[in-house]
């Protein structure tokens, strides 16, 4: 029995040492062998795109353009912003990005008085800032890339006047009463319809860049002012909300002019509910914004404004063509600024929204 017990004990010791022997051999056998795969290189630069609402499909298209441009140069763009428009949170994200030492910032200058100090502080701290979609021209930002929002409003007003025969009672829903781009669009629209005595804006409401609020405000306008027979939505979500309300009420007599060519907007145009929309170039804004930050890093001189084209896209045109892309510039009947400065682009690395925003 004793020899057998000794054999069992020996076997147990051998078994217990087998993992150590195996992994020790593995370590010895690979110590001079190069790894089969290479570590991903660090990005050449780290920019951030800070939007007013990361859930807005329009800003997803802007981000896609920025991400494609960054990838073409071996860099990265992080997409940040509140989940619902909130200027205070937006500004905090700019401040946090500056503190984190990012290489550049693309952001809106939603309200110039509010955003100018934080943009100026970023520049003073050595972080280049390019405004996108909405400018803050009196700030120290390096450049602006985006639509000429006043001209886009003028174009919208002229088109509505022409389409309605110069006679309409108009309800307007704008994304914000404070945002510079929204104020510019509304001012352009008002100036364009002023020569037409039969055109009158009955009331203006704000959706605060919220689909739910846009629906509520549209319903309010139609309930309070039954004479309204035309609607203008000045931000991307307003027109689709108007279409939903008007369609639900069976009001085929209401002329709707929207802003941007989101897939839902295009679908309502196919159904004949939205008559036309003002088309922007969000992808190009994002792409060219990154290109401008890279040019600034090379100490190249930048112009103050780089306007991207805007144009009217009609329901008739949509119905005569194939499916539209999601939010890309769809082409249209008239560019407001065909001679705008163009940058030239070559095109996608990304991190998801809200990574640095504990507030959401």
Model-derived regions: residue spans:
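Hinge/cleft segment of the Venus flytrap/periplasmic-binding protein
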Residues: 7-13, 21-35, 193, 284-360
């Amino acid at each position: 029995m004793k020899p057998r017990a000794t054999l069992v004990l020996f076997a147990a010791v051998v078994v217990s040492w087998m993992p150590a022997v195996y992994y020790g051999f593995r370590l010895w056998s690979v110590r001079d062998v190069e790894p089969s795969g290479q570590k991903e290189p660090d990005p050449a630069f780290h920019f951030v795109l800070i939007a007013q609402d990361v859930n807005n499909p329009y800003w997803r298209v802007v981000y896609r353009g920025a991400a494609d441009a960054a990838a073409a140069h071996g860099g990265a763009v992080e997409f940040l912003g509140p989940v619902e428009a909130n200027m205070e949170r937006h500004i905090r994200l700019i401040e946090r990005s500056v503190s984190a030492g990012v290489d550049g910032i693309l952001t809106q200058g939603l309200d110039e008085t509010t955003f100018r100090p934080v943009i100026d502080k970023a520049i003073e701290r050595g972080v280049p800032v390019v405004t996108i979609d909405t400018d803050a021209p009196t700030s120290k930002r390096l450049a602006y890339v985006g639509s000429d929002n006043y001209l886009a409003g003028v174009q919208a007003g002229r088109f509505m006047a022409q389409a309605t025969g110069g006679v309409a009672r108009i309800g307007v829903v704008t994304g914000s009463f404070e945002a510079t781009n929204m104020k510019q669009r509304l001012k352009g629209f008002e100036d364009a319809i002023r020569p037409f005595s039969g055109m009158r804006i009955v009331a203006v409401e704000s959706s605060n860049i919220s689909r739910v609020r846009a629906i509520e405000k549209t319903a309010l306008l139609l309930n309070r002012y039954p004479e309204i027979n035309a609607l203008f939505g000045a931000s991307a979500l307003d027109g689709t909300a108007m279409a939903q309300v008007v369609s639900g009420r069976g009001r085929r007599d209401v002329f709707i002019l929207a802003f941007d060519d989101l897939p839902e907007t295009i679908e309502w145009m196919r159904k004949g509910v939205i008559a036309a929309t003002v088309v922007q170039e969000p992808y190009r804004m994002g792409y060219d914004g990154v290109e401008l930050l890279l040019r600034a890093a090379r100490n190249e001189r930048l112009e103050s404004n780089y306007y991207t084209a805007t144009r009217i896209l009609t329901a008739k045109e949509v119905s005569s063509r194939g499916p539209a892309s999601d939010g890309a510039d769809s082409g249209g009947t008239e560019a407001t600024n065909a001679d705008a400065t163009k940058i030239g682009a070559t095109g996608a690395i990304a991190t998801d929204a809200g990574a640095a925003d504990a507030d959401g």
